Amino acid sequence: MLVVPARLHRWPPEVQDLFGREGPLVLEIGFGDGRFTAELARSRPDWLVLGAEVSAASVLRALRRMRREGLANVRLYHGQGPFALRNLVLPGTLDQVIVNFPDPWPKKRHQERRLLREAFFRRLSTRLKPGGSLLLTTDHEEYFRFALEEAERTGLYRVEVRPPPEAHLRTKYALKWKEAGRAFFHAAFIKLREDPAPWPPLRRYDVAHALLSGELPQDLALEKTPVRLKEGVAVFLEVARGKEGFYVLTHVEEEDLTQDLLLEVRKSARGVYAGVSRFGSPLITEAVKGAVRALVDRLEAHGLEVVQDHT
């Protein structure tokens, strides 16, 4: 029921491989505690519902709910919606996207963090079927108007402003705002045409490591300052000494993907190994390779020399 992208053999996977059968595919971005997701899956057992949520606590609550209710037509992903859209959905296969009460990021300096921007609508068009749609429900009028303008700017959608369906007002936040007497806004963004720019899945790699000659340092002091990468940023958060060497807790951010993973520096039969630990099923991306390269640079500063480089 929980989708772990690193364990998928293919990106994006076939619907059959993800769900075990074919059917109309729906993506819910930001499912919270999963109560709307569960209601949707119960009411439309023929639908296949893929949910994306950034909160680990919410994902856990939703997983428990789906298992408790025995909902076999739901798959949940812990991470950002655009990542799921890009890497878990094949082009032209998505029937509907549902976005209920997204974070409005009301401050002007934070508006680039908003989900429903022009670039997102353009990319979404590559995944929706002809006539597929995105349904937005929000209590934030300014965000609602912003989303309408961003979609209309693409020329790829017909926008229909409608009363919100009752089911969309039974989410955790909707019930809270309803008690507070807030107004709600709802629109359907229906695909008319597709953006010509392709949106291929994120490139991933099997390995990211290097072999070095020299002695393993007695100490590996790594500053907690951001390492700027071409694809994003990495921060070495903490170093722990083990029997064979060091483990480095590393935070890596890139477009639509944030990972906390372990890098390791240890003795091997052929020298000193520096690379990604497989603990936690990390995704080896260009940014992760860049983080390993930055770690190797620190080791070179300790006098080690690279003899094999797969970063």
UniProtKB/Swiss-Prot annotation:
It is an enzyme of class 2 (transferase). It comes from the Bacteria. It catalyses: guanosine(46) in tRNA + S-adenosyl-L-methionine = N(7)-methylguanosine(46) in tRNA + S-adenosyl-L-homocysteine. GO terms for molecular function: tRNA (guanine(46)-N7)-methyltransferase activity. The active site is at 103. Pathway: tRNA modification; N(7)-methylguanine-tRNA biosynthesis. Its EC number is 2.1.1.33. This is tRNA (guanine-N(7)-)-methyltransferase.
